[in-house]
């Protein structure tokens, strides 16, 4: 059973060691984010030359190595893109497929080796260029990283938005066999959601990514979706009985650290998966 959690986007000093880890699940931390933008006061696109934009002081190479040494069920991934940087939207903005892929392979290989990472997650949410360009760039990138033995798993993080889905479904159609998990952002839906409605959305996304391991999700910030206190775990139990619960992911450790429920729901999710 797989549990995954995004970490590091909010620079509030959250550390890997703050997060409770159940030894009986596969546990993935996902660093948020690496972005192909310049790191400076006004970030601009770099055509595939990625830089770390997560809290590298608290989530450093030595801290990655330490948490993986402590728990042999922990792997660490990095998410590409994200919604915004410095208050501006992050765009997927390649000059050409081949130049973007070459730059991305070399810059990400460096980051992945430096930080002892195991996988990548694709979380672009705004796009310049058409779905086919996105499919080729990302598809070729993940194919090469896997073939070179740089990463052992890949996930994508779409949500229910027409433009987003058209890009990720184009990628899925051509390169779905290279993608191990679909981190579907169910928390982007409205928060006025019943368990039945959630299960309906889940089936809808399973059919959008046929054959994919669609993971369910909740957020610990104030965004939407089905919250733990409103029946999220009831929905999970139903999916588990049906053999459809491939895993759970959470946005985000940063928010949980600051919430009144400090990591309570992370523990609940992991014990449900481990049971």
From Swiss-Prot:
A GO molecular function annotation here is: endochitinase activity
Q: GO biological process: any one?
A: chitin catabolic process
Active-site annotation: 125 (proton donor)
EC annotation from Swiss-Prot or TrEMBL: 3.2.1.14
Pinpoint the GH18 domain residues.
1-270
Enzyme category, top tier? hydrolase
Catalytic reaction annotation: Random endo-hydrolysis of N-acetyl-beta-D-glucosaminide (1->4)-beta-linkages in chitin and chitodextrins
Q: Which UniProt keywords apply?
A: Carbohydrate metabolism, Chitin degradation, Chitin-binding, Glycosidase, Hydrolase, Polysaccharide degradation
- The protein's role, per its UniProt record: Able to cleave glycolchitin.
Similarity-based family: Belongs to the glycosyl hydrolase 18 family. Chitinase class II subfamily.
This protein is called Chitinase 2
At the highest ranks, the source species' classification is:
Eukaryota, Viridiplantae, Streptophyta, Embryophyta, Tracheophyta
